[in-house]
């Protein structure tokens, strides 16, 4: 069963989040863009695994990896979109213009661990982002979507990343790690 390792992104704790998100969704709707919004569970996927053959072994290794990974601040300050790998949808996302090197390092470590166990995982290059919604690619071009997004006021949300979770895709948690301060 598909599962993934993610860093939880606590943007909802930011005072301006709800207002900004509501306004952003309203402007996109007013532009006539159909979006299937992802609500409430905001995260940055570090590793997407296609099966669960080695979950116990991976979790032991992830445990060691997470013991070396400290909580860290991040500023979410960019709204954009890209086309998903299958080409069927465009992903509306948030990210940081300055991704902390620790995030890149832990994603690389997770992939190295998965490789060492011959785990079947998504090997596309790591693109740190927080998915907000999906737009059908047959309804709106990426250029049209980006044109609308780039007219929306840029977000600036500061948060502390302090929790990593291994979970089944659209399902139960497998393991949660609270990061050290």
Locate the predicted segments by residue.
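Extracellular/lumenal ectodomain signal focusing on beta-strand-rich modules
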Residues: 76-78, 163
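Basic, often amphipathic N-terminal segments
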Residues: 1-75, 100-154, 173-181
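Low-complexity, intrinsically disordered Gly/Pro/Thr-rich segments
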Residues: 148-167
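Short beta-strand element of the conserved SAM-dependent methyltransferase core
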Residues: 5, 93-97, 166
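Short, low-order "capping/linker" segments at domain edges
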Residues: 86-96, 172-181
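Short, low-complexity Ser/Thr-rich regulatory SLiMs
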Residues: 83-85, 168
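A generic structural signal for beta-strand entry/edge sites
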Residues: 2, 89-91, 163
């Amino acid at each position: 069963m598909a599962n993934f390792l993610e860093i939880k992104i606590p943007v909802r704790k930011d005072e301006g989040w709800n207002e900004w998100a509501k306004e952003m969704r309203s402007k996109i709707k007013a532009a006539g863009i159909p979006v299937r919004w992802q609500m409430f569970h905001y995260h940055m996927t570090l590793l997407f695994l296609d099966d669960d053959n080695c979950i116990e072994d991976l979790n032991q290794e992830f445990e060691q990896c997470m013991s070396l990974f400290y909580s860290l601040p991040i500023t979410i300050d960019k709204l954009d979109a890209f086309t998903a790998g299958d080409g069927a949808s465009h992903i509306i996302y948030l990210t940081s213009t300055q991704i902390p090197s620790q995030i890149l390092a832990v994603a690389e470590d997770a992939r190295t661990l998965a490789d060492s166990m011959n785990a079947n995982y998504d090997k596309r290059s790591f693109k740190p982002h927080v998915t907000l919604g999906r737009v059908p690619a047959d309804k709106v071009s990426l250029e049209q979507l980006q044109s609308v997004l780039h007219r929306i006021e840029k977000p600036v949300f500061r948060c502390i990343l302090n929790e990593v979770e291994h979970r089944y895709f659209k399902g139960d948690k497998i393991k949660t790690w609270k990061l050290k301060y």
